[in-house]
Design a protein with these regions (language model features):
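Alpha-helical transmembrane segments of multi-pass membrane transport proteins
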Residues: 10-345
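Single conserved hydrophobic/aromatic residue that forms the stacking wall/gate
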Residues: 1-13
Length: 345
């Protein structure tokens, strides 16, 4: 991201940052982690080139939301388990919304930079230098190729792809890059166990929670209550979108999916929405929640990384949130858009 290309004299800061966040977020599955890791590198680089610090922080916070939509994504995995939907189909359904969100945000950031006259001091880039940079990163770039190629090619399941990618990353870190010693390897194993244990406990409690609600017929009662008020698909989806946006601002995405999926799924299926389509809706909603004031987690992380006031960053993020909401509405009311790769609605 330090080597930012220029287009018509305007430094296209959004392009490398959004693409980097898409890859990093897809691998990590965490919006806040993406903001922390990428923001620490890109925010200082942008401010050195004359960009406003608050705009740079808001841009990275928004870019961190995009990675959650790009497969392989933890929220899609958790939803697939909760709703008994094919995780592979969910991954494919997340590609179009993620790319659409990234493109509209790139366009906005480019226009904003051009309006402000932020041309920066980009270095001259040639095909040779870009090729050399790609060659230097070839081992790291193979990770998403293994994961996505293995899953979409039908060679392996998401679980098998994750295991192979983890083993590949260990080999590369230990023997090729030689940046991971025994101590760092052990620390990475401990951190991985901590992260995995959280998800395992969460899913165990989710199963118990879902069984209790099923026995008590809570989802059916809520579905009958909402559908008793209105049977309009447009109104029901609008109300659910508002609910998910509110929940996404203060609740961790995986927990929200586990709790809300068994409650809302009977409602949306009652108005003709498929579980696959609803998976896209809920994940895109919760991704937007990461950057929605006043308690969007990505905003807090970006504020800490940039050492900037939260309210100023939130103000800069509002136009980006509006564009993300536009993508959400398209994905909600035009299911053929996010599901075009899957091939069924």
């Amino acid at each position: 991201a330090y080597e930012m290309p220029t287009v018509t004299g305007v430094q296209t800061c959004a392009l490398p940052i959004f693409v980097t966040c898409m890859f990093f977020g897809a691998i990590s599955g965490s919006g806040p982690a993406t903001v922390a890791a990428i923001g620490a590198l890109t925010i200082p680089a942008m401010t050195e080139r004359g960009y406003d610090k608050y705009f740079a922080a808001a841009l990275v916070a928004a870019a961190g939301c995009v990675g959650v939509m790009i497969p392989p994504s933890n929220p899609f995995v958790v939803y697939g388990i909760s709703a008994q939907v094919s995780i592979g189909d969910l991954f494919m359904s997340g590609i179009v919304p993620g790319i659409m969100t990234g493109l509209v945000l790139m366009g906005y950031c480019y226009c904003y930079a051009r309006k402000r006259g932020w041309s920066g001091a980009a270095r001259k880039r040639t095909a040779a230098t870009l090729g050399q940079a790609a060659w230097d990163a070839k081992w790291a770039l193979m990770v998403p190729v293994i994961v996505l190629g293995g899953i979409y090619g039908g060679i392996m399941t998401p679980t098998e792809a994750a295991a192979i990618a983890a083993f590949y990353g260990m080999i590369v870190g230990l023997f090729l890059y030689r940046e991971m010693g025994v101590r760092r390897f052990c620390a990475a194993c401990v951190e991985s166990c901590e992260t995995s244990s959280i998800i395992i406990v969460l899913m165990a409690m989710a199963t118990l929670f879902g069984n209790i609600m099923t026995i008590e017929d809570v989802p059916g009662t809520i579905a009958r209550g909402i559908l008793g008020l209105t049977t309009s698909k447009i109104i029901v989806l609008l109300l659910i979108n508002v609910l998910l946006l509110i929940v996404g601002t203060f609740m961790e995405a995986l927990a929200a999916i586990v709790i809300l999926t068994p409650i809302l799924l009977p409602v949306v299926t009652g108005v003709g929405v498929t579980p696959l389509h609803f998976g896209v809706i809920i994940v895109v909603n919760l991704a937007i929640g990461f950057i929605t004031p006043p308690v969007g987690v990505n905003l807090f992380v970006a504020s800490g990384v940039a050492r900037a006031r939260l309210e100023r960053i939130s103000g800069m993020a509002l136009p980006m949130i509006a564009l993300m909401l536009l993508v959400l509405l398209i994905c909600t009311y035009l299911p053929q858009v996010p599901l075009c790769i899957v091939g069924h609605h």
